[in-house]
Amino acid sequence: MSPGSGSSSVTIGSAGTIDPMPSAVLATGRAPRDTSPMSFATSLTNHFLIAMPGLDDPNFSRTVTYVCEHTEQGAMGIVINRPMDIKLGEVLEQLDIEPSVAGVSDAQVFLGGPVQTDRGFVIHSGPTEYDSTLTVTADLRVTTSKDVLEAIAAGQGPAQCLVALGYAGWGGGQLEQELSANAWLSGPADAQILFSKPVGERWLAAARL
């Protein structure tokens, strides 16, 4: 589902593992360019990327991105402070899921990034794994399969979760170059900021970690 659109369909429910970069695209949504990547030193998996004030890309200005995976081949993250104009109830309706718990339909949906904005991602607490779950840490996972939303709608889902459409992706070496150019501040992820902190406070809170 595209931001502000009620007619596009949401894609969630494919089984198997998550492909961190399904289309080998960058965070901008363009094909990778030859960047002569820097050497890979430290993985930022389970870290926040906090956009620096000078980052004027409209896709990432004043954003906080949760890095789900970061290897020599590239990185994938979900923006956690860009609420969309839709609620979870609209996503559930498109997937023919009937919520049986009060309040579920009112949960916020976030724009996770500019790539594949019709694809759903759920960042959630553990330990349950679903049909298509990437285990990030012992306590945090990312799931793209429909069964996690069915569990949430039935009141049997994870204790904490964040639902997003789309993701941010970086080709090999690109994120390292952006960090060297001071586009991002990085810091360890914090579950309270990820799930509980008011959206408007997440950028400053993450920057203070």
Go through the PLM ranges and name each one:
Residues 2-14, 23, 30, 36:
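Low-acidity, Ser/Thr- and Arg-rich intrinsically disordered low-complexity segments
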Residues 37-163, 168-209:
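A short aromatic-anchored loop/beta-hairpin motif
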